[in-house]
């Protein structure tokens, strides 16, 4: 649910000239084209012409920054001048407000900006003053000496088009024009003598107006914006936003609840039930479903319509005031000043009620049909459809497993949000709420947060605490959060509370309707108001401008309420030396190189409504003197109002912190003569700080005489506090809402900040922060449990790719995604780099150009040229018969359909071209609603990725063949040249992954698909994907491997992959150059068509050089083959011809009835060994469904002599080891194997038992086991008796996440042949925990991932994962203490007996990914510090404190853990 504030602050300018836009510590004042690229509706690298009605792209910009234009407007400059916060938000979310949205044209229109202080302006003087030549960015020549070009954004009538106004070559400054008494940015300006005159006097060229409408998504590629997408009609490019990225393919579902106009200080209103965003878009044209764009009755007033319709209301152009007038003696009431009010906590409360099953809004929050929302703006007001309630009962019918999330978009200062159950200030009752909500007590929740933050009593700047209220940001004792309101320093009298955090905490600890807790993500828009931090020595002093109205319009200076002035504009005159001598703003000629700032603040004299314009201007001059003191001087410059205003600041970080009201406002039309006679009046007031008096001095009875007024100029000198400020500011409520709004606890990102709090300080980062929020939300669901890391030894180019999947619409739609994450220097997952779905071609022409190949039968070197084809309909005909119907039947038959079946499923008019184009990604035959057209509607371009694990081809890859002495010298030498050429090239790196859309996909390192291959083994049922009643099938679901190999006289990069559960097939592709992949690069495909021993190959294949000089692919035959045997395949890598098959027969009849789930056998995962160091394979270990661990001997050059290594006295093959449970029943082995050198000789093989692919496997409670088996080269191991046991025990104290103890019994290899760990907690019954992943060896430790299926009560796919870290030699605990960076700063869990940690997640983890930071790169803490883990010592990993490793959890990358490791070369040897 998108929860969105909609108050007036959204309509201020995006670039206010008083923000640090690029994070360099320096305020970015004015336009910085060489430093910053400004975000907005215009293409920053394009030149625009103004044609009188709109801006149009005309040419590519030039110059070294790519932004300069001659005689035209630079798009980047227009973004800087014209973008409002609302414009930026609209563009981020859905591409912008489309005023025109036709098939051939899109025109975006800027947000309405009334002619008051919401309007803004910029100015230009000269190259020497501003740093750029205006003629490079606008069709203007330089102004004359002492003159300025002024720019303003405003709207000149209530229904008018927003305008960019240009007042050229004038002597006036920008504040003389846009900060004048109403109307602003009009025809009048004020002079330095405070006189109102015509702006066109004094040599001005006059005012020119430019309507703020822009035509976007040009047909010219070089002019088109990067967010324009080509839709299927092949003519419409449309601007898109992040809702398109995450919602158009239904990866996420969105609803919208916002504040309302009618109830502006109460509650919130649902405008869109949670639904698919794609319903708001015409899938063929990309038009929004508004104004008849989706046919009769097809309009959808959803998220786009609502946010596009939002605007400022109630501004009257007759007198330039708001309808509520001047409210000066009390806070605003309901229905007054519609644009003010942001009750965020109450909106969040409504959202919890919605998730919890409520069927209607709270009456206190609801609006009626005569409201401004409905009657004026025509906003939608739908009936509530609770997401987890079934459709037949009026709900949306979503799965209880779907993760409910609130994403809150709001200014950091909520207001008036105290009308909630349990509120300190109201008797609001939740008795009628859903059952899950009835225990909500916001005061109790808020106080729990206070205690979690340390509790006690502290001094904070706040408007009210524990009934102590002065409506000012004065220091007050705070002892809880439940009685705090009046957010400071900006809005101490507007009733903003911390109840939003309380509501979030309640949702994170209570399940609302579904089976999961509600998670809160906050996109916090920084206040548009200024806050200045001054470096003073080694400390920082914070200063925020502040003013109060004290007399006029009935205000009583001694009453309970005096309006806090709104800061409605500010102008930085000069700022320097704020970032030290190396900073970009350093200037030794200004204040001796010490910090200096000079700025003007414009104050409005009431808190809301009125005329919302400048009523007083104060000039602030602040600098650090030679004594390292902060000097603050204020001067009253201008006034135009009938209310007396006292102006000052709130300061902290000094020895005299507090609220200072220092100066008066001037009498209207008077200039400042330095005496009190120029003031509007002299008013006694409790917050006054007369010269030489401190805060609180005037708050006395009787009031001292010198408190009777203030001067128009004041200077004060501050010293820095040696122990920090006495009083400080609380963080904003949204920060606490994020911190306590996640059911997994406090979640930190890799930089140590909250992973679900996204502050937006300026528009440049708005899209980035929203993308991070949505990415974090999307990563919660559907992980396939696998991961691939590019650059596990962390460098600047390291990244990880994680596949995921989702299922919707009763299992008729299964979509996949692969997300690439940056890996930060500390090894943790960082920002999202790209999404693979965005890189799959879309649009008819692009889909037609997709590079997709298939094979009409099995493939080898004898038939490759004839059977490998492009995957298009005409190529699926073996040879044309000349008869259309016959050829069509042949194509349909290859895809699994008879002509009758086509008619039954799709109708009689469907052609082979249409079906094949659909499978290539064409959506034109899908309906606008689910399954109303011939083909099934898909909500993403990729199929689900469940068992497939991505493999990565990197430029840095080096497989070591240059040092393989068993290879001929010419091959070794040429390999060195081959890898050097690759490493020095600029070629892209590539990621290969199979998906259940029937394809093996190849993506480059930017996420763009380069080619895809449809194996013949899945071709015969590929057409089923189009069936509207589709039930899930596996297709390309197997594992792949990648290596360099010497084929036909040259080195090539080869991928060998399998279809896994999707079919009985293995294939090999030459991927040396993925960008030029063609038919000849399909080397071979072997399937059950040409070999009855081929089964469903679930194991990973290997690419190896053999001792007979051949290169081969080696793999187990998989499961459920026709013959039902366990067979090792050795296939010529270049030709696909079979070199040798070796059956591993254990004497169990496949048709027999062995008690341990025997049935048919099959060989799964392997481990290959080079025992003599020559680079050639000598041995292979493999495991099967009968629990056998086999050893195959491949030594020697004669393939006929290769076979099973161990045999009985009769010459029958026997396994090295048979895995059995304590009762003697065999344990199937389907996970991977890992091998290390043994204690004195031989090898240790690591694996686990368990199965998770057959029917009823989910329900099995059979005991599985982790093993470390020593193959000493002598007699076969005689079962468990020959092994040492380690025991799992429950942790003796609770931790988060959960941990387990594993014993550390000593092991002597003189008497034992390894160890085992039964996957059952001592004293408990087996829960079905099993090992189906591949172990990972690192530094003397072995990492096992295990899975416990079906533990979720409500979600059939539920389960949990555990990570075991065991000593490789003994199997004892070796996890020790670990750092959990995502759960709190420096938190650690575990001790020397800890052997396992819960890693959560619903999907079984199939691979353990690890990154390693380089020595002396950042780690999360320093060993020995409080809460920082020590390095666990293991068999051969001595204590060291410089390096760390991170274990990445593919189910939830934000929950990955870090632990320290020994640096440098390890004595423990492992084989790769």
Curated annotation (Swiss-Prot):
Ca(2+) binds at residues 1170, 1172, 1174, 1176, 1178. The keyword rRNA processing does not apply. Induction: Expression is not affected by calcium. Residues 1383-1403 are annotated as: Disordered. The keyword Metal-binding applies. GO terms for cellular component: type IV pilus. Residues 1383-1397 have a biased composition (Polar residues). Keywords: Calcium, Fimbrium, Fimbrium biogenesis, Metal-binding. It comes from the Bacteria. GO terms for biological process: type IV pilus-dependent motility. Its main location: other. It is found in: Fimbrium. GO terms for molecular function: metal ion binding. Disruption phenotype: Shows twitching motility. Loss of increased twitching motility at higher Ca(2+) concentrations. Forms T4P. Impaired in the calcium-mediated increase in single-cell attachment to surfaces, but biofilm formation is not affected. One of the three PilY1 homologs of X.fastidiosa, which are involved in bacterial twitching motility as component of the filamentous type IV pili (T4P). The twitching motility of this protein is enhanced by calcium, which may provide the bacterium an adaptive advantage in environments with high calcium concentrations. Belongs to the PilY1 family. This is Type IV pilus biogenesis factor PilY1 homolog PD_1611. The gene is pilY1_1.
